[in-house]
Amino acid sequence: MGSSLILDNNFDNLNFSSLKIGIIQSEWNSKITDLLMISSRNYFLEVGIDNKNIITRKVPGSMELVYASNHMLINHDVDGIVTLGCIIKGETDHDKHIANAVSNGLVSVSIKHNKPISFGVLTTNNHNQALSRAGGNKGDKGKESAYTLLKMLDLVWV
């Protein structure tokens, strides 16, 4: 089953010319996260966000997304952040521990700074599942994460 998220691009309250967006990409599983980054960034450009207002950073792995998000919110005055990563199950439960720590950490950072952080971290059983969610037949989670951030910003800018 593909994604059921409908990208309506209906953002009544956003002034795209003044938005400043952060995108933080994990380099682990970069063949996947590169695709997520391209589609996320392209979506922001398509809706009219100026390229100079999109700040991108790369971190070694998904765990580092938490620290980097906190740092970006403190030092770059962004309105919100898209985090992109790919955690693929291995032989142990390590993936679950990483995914839980990252999701909980990003929620904490978002609440601490009162700014939205969109969770574009894939958690899959294998590489093919990840590819199918990075623009394949199961959706484009990079684009969907960018859309989700804009929907949240539209909500809070009322």
Regions found by a protein language model. Give the residues of each.
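Short glycine/serine/threonine-rich phosphate/pyrophosphate-binding segments
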Residues: 4, 33, 65-66
